[in-house]
A protein has these predicted regions:
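A short beta-sheet element
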Residues: 68-133
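Alpha-helix boundary/capping residues
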Residues: 44, 132-135
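Generic marker of residues within folded, mature protein domains
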Residues: 27, 55-56, 81, 106
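Short secondary-structure capping/turn segments at boundaries of alpha-helices and beta-strands
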Residues: 50-53, 76-78
Length: 135
């Protein structure tokens, strides 16, 4: 419950500052630029599930596998090698389309789960996540 409240507060502040531009008299500051997701992140999509899969986390199978879905943030199982190691954002492209999730630990995306790994010299994963949640 506390996490949900903090998430809602973060989204409200983000919207106020970066979508509605309230602190800037509703105008984009002159030193800000407009860009595309392709310019600020490395985009990818999940494919087939790995060969080595466990339904539970173990010492060997410690990396989560995520698919499209709301239940348990799309957790499918665990594997022994991550595909994405950096903090990133996933967006479901099948089933529950548009479900956005911030990923903090290495993982494997499957079944057309869209991945956005930010170019950290331009944007943070948290900013990207909050921006995508506004869409």
């Amino acid at each position: 419950m506390l996490n949900e409240n903090l998430e809602q507060q973060a989204q409200a502040i983000f919207k106020s500052w970066f979508i509605d531009l309230e602190p800037f008299s509703n105008r984009k500051p002159s030193d800000w630029s407009v860009s595309t997701l392709g310019n600020v992140s490395i985009m990818g999509a999940g494919g087939d599930k790995p060969q080595n899969v466990s339904p539970i986390k173990t010492d060997l199978y410690k990396y989560p596998i995520y698919s499209n879905g709301l239940s348990n943030e799309g957790l499918y199982g665990f594997t022994d090698k991550p595909k994405i190691s950096e903090e990133s954002v996933t967006v479901s492209a099948r089933g529950t389309i548009g479900f956005v999730c911030l990923r903090h630990i290495p993982y494997v995306p499957i079944v057309r789960l869209v991945t956005l790994t930010p170019k950290t010299e331009i944007i943070s994963a948290k900013y990207l996540y909050l921006w995508l949640k506004q869409l």
